[in-house]
Amino acid sequence: LAILKAKSPSCGSGVIYDGTHTHTLAEGDGVFARLLRREGVCVVSEDMVESCKPSVEHPVAIVLGTGLGHLAALVKPVRRIDYHDIEGFPRDARPVRGHSFEATIGTIDGVPVVVYPGRIHLYQGYSAEEVTALVRHAHRLGCRDIFFACATGAVPGNAHVGLGILTDQVNLTGQNPLAGSNLRDVETPFVGMTDAYTPYLRTLARGVADDLGITVEEGVFAGVMGPCFETPAEVAMLRGMDVSYTGFSTALEVILAHALGMNVLGMTLASNESGDPKMSHQSVLEAAERHADDFERLVRGVLRLL
């Protein structure tokens, strides 16, 4: 990607993201711009970049999972919204430990955001439509980009404990937010799921991690119903399916966000190995605390480049 100054007669200087994902200013001209295009590099004007940046009209939505709600403290708030005032969100819902039910609209490092520091889950008895209510809300607020962060188990042999970027998913919940007769805001339920996790956002996140020295892995996510953790047989099945991470959320949210035309970035904190007999909700919270700084740096780094 090359971002070139639109007002320069020679297409000026801009930011070029090379194969190492580092960014440097480079002088260019009309010939340079044509050369970049010939090499398959996307060249866009500064004006176009400004029109696509997050704005008050198009904030970035961030949905946070178990133990990751601390990111909400980074927001310079303009407005707060109780989840129970969001259309479609169940009024009787109460947050589990590590979640909060108050969205914050504001900015992080000057970037307009809407942060949702908690979720509800299928295993609590809620429907696919209810667990995706936050996605519909973000879409109606004008969000074009949405980040999903979740706590997961790392499938032994395919991933390690730590931060990860989701590349694809397998929906094993038996539920789908596009099934049924209530298809508000969605043109058709027959949605192709190729690149449900937007490729350029994945590349951007990987580049930010490399630049900041943050260790991240990449892999496929499997969404399961929960609340039980995986049996050894289930872990073996997931390993054979080339699944790297498994968790109780995210899969349905990604389906709806993709169907709504939103750009999706999936990030995970693998707090344990799937099938670990010592696994508990408390251990997830403790792992989230250990990785809090790196997670915050990664999110802030991606936001700065949008």
Question: What function would you assign to each model-found segment?
Answer:
Residues A138-G142, R239, H258:
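Non-catalytic positions within long, well-ordered alpha-helices that form the structural scaffold/packing
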Residues F248-S283:
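Zn-dependent metallopeptidase/amidohydrolase metal-coordination segment
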Residues R144, S244, N263:
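Short acidic/polar active-site loop segments enriched in Thr and Asp
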